[in-house]
Amino acid sequence: MPIIKVRENEPFDVALRRFKRSCEKAGILAEIRRREFYEKPTTERKRAKASAIKRLAKKLTRENARRIRMY
């Protein structure tokens, strides 16, 4: 869990903003959303595989676009 130390004479909203930013960087909200409902292991594997395929397609598209620009 992210911990911030409130500095002397620091307004509350500034400290809250720093805390929210550190929570976002740690990925806490995404983890909570992911664990909100039970996901069967098969569904989890299927989702992970689909995201890997999507990542690969995106990478290949970028590389292909880079090659086209070179010529």
UniProtKB/Swiss-Prot annotation:
UniProt GO molecular function: structural constituent of ribosome
Keywords, alphabetical: Ribonucleoprotein, Ribosomal protein
- Which PROSITE patterns does the record cross-reference, listed alphabetically? RIBOSOMAL_S21
Gene Ontology CC annotation, any one:
ribonucleoprotein complex
UniProt-listed GO biological process terms: translation
Q: Which family does it belong to?
A: Belongs to the bacterial ribosomal protein bS21 family.
What NCBIfam families would the database entry show? S21p
Protein name as catalogued: Small ribosomal subunit protein bS21
Gene behind this protein: rpsU
